[in-house]
Design a protein with these regions (language model features):
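Acidic, glycine-rich loop-and-beta core segments that form the ion-binding/anion-interacting portion
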Residues: 223-285
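Internal alpha/beta core interface subdomains
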Residues: 78, 82-210, 221
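Conserved active-site and cofactor/substrate-binding residues in soluble primary-metabolism enzymes
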Residues: 13-17, 37, 73-80, 134, ...
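Basic, polar low-complexity surface loops/patches
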Residues: 1-100, 104-107, 112
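Short acidic, glycine/serine/threonine-rich loops at helix termini
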Residues: 15-17, 40-44, 109-114, 143-145, ...
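A glycine- and small-aliphatic-rich helix-loop capping segment at beta-alpha/alpha-beta transitions
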Residues: 21-26, 47-50, 113-122, 144-152, ...
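Conserved small/polar residues in nucleotide/adenosyl-binding loops
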Residues: 292-295
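Accessory "access/gating" subregions that flank catalytic or transport cores
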Residues: 197-226, 231-235, 280-283, 289
Length: 295
């Protein structure tokens, strides 16, 4: 049984709450796209939980959570998120959290470049309303084959070091020539990778194989989207979109089992629209109607 839960607005529809509610009937909850640029908020008897990267099913002890290969993951933010959850009594281990070896790493220079570019564009009013979490630059470098993946943290060898050197050399052309910044240090980036290699290597695996076996065993799998359909890079209001495919059809692909078919797709919306990030309000109503609906 493969089910997807996606937003059909601009995000902020309440998907996290619905995943938390429905996940009691599922064995696995998997995120398939996005990064830490939006949050799912869940309130229960233990308090309030804000989840940016980890699937909302983590709050249920019998649910295994998967972070799919379609995601871009900032290990620094993931560490903080895990710490915040464990401090509130949520148990997290490689048994109930599995990270795809194919997921792209959001590096510190991705976050820095995002902020610098948004600042540059804002001078002429051309900014996109980025959350400045490095998401677009992580995905951009993914498609240009100029970044590392989570699986590289498992094998921190000379080959990975060489790739990192090539990546940093290319990135420094942008950071120095366009933004006038100091060059990124390869040694600092390598030390950063080594830190998170030690922390997350036990969690990293072939989640496609794990999900395929689970499906064959009859386990119930829920795919949790981040943001909404109108933020989809292909089907959203371009260019005011996110940088990934948020629609339900992408769920099996981004999670790691592209040959599988969804049995159920659930769309979440709310009575009035709000959104994550900035951008034009393309369906804004006349003031008289707006005042009426806001009362």
């Amino acid at each position: 049984m493969l089910t997807s839960i996606t937003g059909i607005n601009w995000g902020d529809e309440g998907k996290g709450r619905m995943v938390d509610l429905l996940s009691q009937d599922y064995d696995i909850v998997a995120r398939y796209q996005g990064g830490d640029n939006a949050g799912h908020t869940v309130k229960n008897e233990r308090g309030k939980f804000v989840l940016n990267l980890i699937p909302s099913g983590i709050l249920r002890p019998d649910v295994v959570c998967v972070m799919g290969g379609g995601m871009v993951i900032d290990p620094e933010h993931l560490e903080k998120e895990i710490t915040s959850l464990t401090e509130k009594g949520v148990e997290i281990s490689p048994k109930n959290l599995k990270i795809s070896d194919r997921a792209t790493i959001t590096m510190p220079f991705h976050v820095a470049q995002d902020g610098l570019e948004e600042e540059r564009l804002s001078k002429t009013g051309a900014q996109f309303g980025s959350t400045k979490r490095g998401i677009a630059y992580s995905y951009g470098d993914k498609y240009m084959k100029k970044t590392l993946r989570m699986g590289d943290l498992v094998h921190m060898d000379a080959g990975v070091r060489k790739r990192l050197e090539t990546i940093v050399e290319s990135k420094n052309l942008t950071m120095e020539k366009i933004y006038g910044q100091k060059p990124v240090s390869v040694d600092e980036m390598w030390a950063w990778c080594e830190k998170y290699s030690k922390l997350f290597a036990p969690y990293i695996c072939d989640v496609g194989d794990y999900l395929d076996k689970a499906d064959r065993e009859g386990k119930k799998i829920m795919f949790e989207a981040q943001l909404g359909a109108l933020r989809d890079i292909d089907f959203g209001i371009y260019p005011y979109t996110s940088s990934s495919n948020t629609v339900s059809a992408y769920a099996p692909i981004g999670a790691g089992i592209p040959g599988h078919k969804l049995n159920l797709s659930i769309g979440i919306m709310k009575a009035y629209s709000s959104c994550v990030g900035d951008g034009p309000f393309t369906t804004e109503l006349a003031m008289t109607c707006l005042l009426y609906t806001s009362d």
